[in-house]
Amino acid sequence: MNSIQNLENSRSDHAQTIITKTTCPYCGVGCGVNIEVQHKTQGVAVQVAGDTEHPANFGRLCIKGSNLADTLGLETRVLNPMLGRKNHRSVTTWDVAIEKIADQFQSCIDQYGPESVAFYVSGQLLTEDYYVVNKFVKGYLGTANIDTNSRLCMSSAVAAHKRSFGEDIVPASYEDFEHADMVVLVGSNTAWCHPVLYQRIMQAKSQNPDLFVVVVDPRFTSTCEQADLHLPILPGQDVALFKGLLQYLYQHGYADHQFVESYTEGLQALLEANRTEQDFRAVVKRTGISAEKLQLLNTELD
């Protein structure tokens, strides 16, 4: 846990209670958490509560954050390599475990070739760790089958932010939801993946019934249930949708030309390149979104 701040340290003959402020380590909402630890004669008791003063969650926690205490003890943590399946595992040494893994890799490669094995590694490795594992997989085993959580999770966002804003930063705050007229969620089942943030959106909508919530997702998710408009887009056609929206907004006079001139580049070239293929009918055809729903989105943008 990072940036831990002790709030209370009360001592007695029987127990020492320490409450620390920290941040939930799971999703990107960054909820504040108060961890209460009691050091008793018979062990350590841990309780978790949302930080009511934290600007991200104001005391709210989702089920993952609420169960953080379950991850702090050593009772269910694997501390040694284990061999076996399900309830028939036994503790072994690192030497035996590494030899077992190597034998399995060698057997697959001998029988089916190096393309028969693959690695999926963490997004939290150090740069040096990434270098070593890539050398091992590509240079030694001879396969390109390696991927990380980073590519699916944040690398794409980093690239998009840098190209759009010049820096890997999100130029918005959660308070913006309370002042928004429209919220568009793209490919995000926010109700499940970021439930605390979703509650803030729904609270903003309850206070402002005119807030129009749009969900762009091939699936009908729990987030769609409370949305005003669900756009069941075909997979991989998000860019086509946004190019079409760009054309619509520009053609109907919604462009802030002073802002465009001062802070963007390449807009005219983009508009010209997509002038013929991104009209209303083309967007309907490519995205699979019905003309009625697409027109409703355009109308709400007006």
What would you call each of these model-derived segments?
Residues L245, S262-D302:
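Active-site phosphate/pyrophosphate-binding segments
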Residues H257-Q258:
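Short, solvent-exposed loop/beta-turn-alpha elements that line the ligand-binding surface or hinge
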Residues M1-H252, G266-L270, S290-L294:
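N-terminal export/assembly segments and adjacent metallocofactor-ligating motifs
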